[in-house]
Amino acid sequence: MKISSHEMVPTHEIIPREEIPLLLEKYSIKMQQFPKLLDTDPLVLEIGATPGDVVKITRMSPTAGESTYYRLVIATSL
């Protein structure tokens, strides 16, 4: 089963690496300030994201309409 095909799962997409500096500038943040997403997350595995990638997550909200947020993929520490 593809997790992304479930109606409750928001859209996840990898931001191209060359666009990350623009995103950091837009929000006046550093890479380490993004919320984290583990590289073992089932959706991360499904879209092929690797540590260092930034994932754009777009979901629909009944109050805000479309809501977009970003997460940094990090390696799982063992």
Curated annotation (Swiss-Prot):
It comes from Methanococcus maripaludis (strain DSM 14266 / JCM 13030 / NBRC 101832 / S2 / LL). It comes from the Archaea. DNA-dependent RNA polymerase (RNAP) catalyzes the transcription of DNA into RNA using the four ribonucleoside triphosphates as substrates. Part of the RNA polymerase complex. It is an enzyme of class 2 (transferase). The lineage of its organism: Archaea, Methanobacteriati, Methanobacteriota, Methanomada group, Methanococci. It is found in: Cytoplasm. It holds the Pfam family RNA_pol_Rpb5_C. It catalyses: RNA(n) + a ribonucleoside 5'-triphosphate = RNA(n+1) + diphosphate. Its EC number is 2.7.7.6. GO terms for molecular function: DNA binding; DNA-directed RNA polymerase activity. Keywords: Cytoplasm, DNA-directed RNA polymerase, Nucleotidyltransferase, Transcription, Transferase. This is DNA-directed RNA polymerase subunit Rpo5. Its main location: cytoplasm. Gene3D superfamilies: RPB5-like RNA polymerase subunit (3.90.940.20). One of its GO terms (biological process) is tRNA transcription by RNA polymerase III. Belongs to the archaeal Rpo5/eukaryotic RPB5 RNA polymerase subunit family. GO terms for cellular component: cytoplasm; DNA-directed RNA polymerase complex. The gene is rpo5.
